[in-house]
From Swiss-Prot:
Coiled-coil residue spans: none
Cited PANTHER family: GMP REDUCTASE
The protein's name: GMP reductase
Listed InterPro entries: Aldolase_TIM (IPR013785), GMP_reductase (IPR050139), GuaC_type_2 (IPR005994), IMP_DH/GMP_Rdtase_CS (IPR015875), IMP_DH_GMPRt (IPR001093)
Binding site residues for NADP(+): 202-225
Stated family: Belongs to the IMPDH/GMPR family. GuaC type 2 subfamily.
Superkingdom of the organism of origin: Bacteria
Listed EC numbers: 1.7.1.7
Example of a GO cellular component annotation carried by this entry: cytosol
């Protein structure tokens, strides 16, 4: 098995077949919806809130609302009242089952539910998937997070419609330091490894530092990428604003941090300050344009044409050119 990450892989261009990069289609289908780009902001308290989710849905972007200090039932009701799709996160404990029951009692069925726990290859996830499939058979279930092909196979067999791959590669995640486990440092290899056995969409979660990493994720089998730090720190971001030496920052912290938990127990995340980057809409437009450019370099016109390109590994024992692997 090759071990590599985003910073030591480059994709090889093919003959361009478009007159303008704007001809390239960066959209992707997930469930019953098609979204403008294969990017979803991380479902974290300092990345998304209800107003951001409304804006994302109105503008054909995918979102997953976080599950912390939130009335999921009211959120789904609000989104449906606006005529928008509803995408929520659940854990695997009794209050999460209660949320499902409350939604059903009101006749509310979200379009997407992400079962979101740190170690998603677990019987508790299997049980929640089974409950959702029984009670809400039409909902699109995303489950995670996982790091191995065995986990992907199990989650798909249990009924997940998509799998979230990535344990601890994110900027504010310290799982690998606290536990010795995870995909930090080899996240892109994990995506490739998992995608080879997947029959349903893979969402690559974490470790994305540059816009070009989106194309690399697609090349190695992801359908979509989940991004935290690059989509935190915007003017609209819900993170607390902090001024340091006359420069404005927004706080950004991991879901398993003590800042999010409210206590120092089983902590696997940290808090950092992100420089304010401007408007979220501008960043998403730039991402779309960069993905269009990636598609043009791939010699294609559609997003999945990126999967046809060759690549090179920079440095290490695996250095060299790799042809359609």
């Amino acid at each position: 098995m090759e071990i590599f990450d985003y910073d030591n892989i480059l994709l090889l261009p093919r003959k361009c077949r478009v007159e303008s990069r704007s001809e390239c289609d960066a959209s992707v289908e997930l469930g019953r919806q098609r979204f403008r780009i294969p990017v979803v902001p991380a479902n974290m308290k300092t990345v998304v809130d209800e107003s951001i989710c409304v804006w994302l849905a109105q503008n054909s972007y995918f979102y997953v609302m976080h599950r912390f200090d939130l009335d999921n039932v009211q959120f789904v009701k609000n989104m449906k009242a606006r005529g928008l799709y509803a995408s929520i996160s659940l854990g695997v404990k009794k209050p999460d089952y209660d949320t499902v029951d409350q939604l059903l009692a009101l006749g509310l069925v979200p379009d997407y539910i992400t079962i979101d726990i740190a170690h998603g290859h677990a019987d508790s996830v299997k049980n929640m998937i089974g409950y959702l499939k029984e009670k809400m058979p039409t909902v699109f279930i995303i489950a995670g997070n996982v790091a191995t092909p065995e986990a992907v196979i199990d989650l798909e067999n249990w009924g997940a419609d998509a799998t979230k791959v990535g344990i601890g590669p994110g900027k504010v995640c310290i799982t690998k330091l606290k536990t010795g486990f995870g995909t930090g440092g080899w996240q892109l290899s994990a995506v490739k490894w998992c995608a080879r056995v997947a029959t349903k969409p893979i969402i690559a979660d974490g470790g994305i530092h540059e816009h070009g990493d989106i194309a690399k994720s697609i090349r190695f089998g992801a359908t979509m990428v989940m991004i935290g730090s690059m989509l935190a720190g915007h003017e609209e971001s819900p993170g607390k604003s902090v001024e340091v030496d006359g420069k404005l920052y927004k706080e950004y912290y991991g879901s398993a941090s003590d800042f999010n938990k409210g206590e120092y127990k089983h902590v696997e995340g940290k808090r950092i300050l992100e420089p304010v980057k401007g408007k979220l809409a501008d960043t998403l437009i730039e991402m779309e344009q960069d993905v269009q450019s990636s598609i043009s370099y791939s010699g294609g016109k559609r997003l999945m044409d990126i999967r046809k390109v060759n690549y090179v590994t920079l440095g290490g024992d695996n250095a060299g050119e790799h042809l359609l692997m």
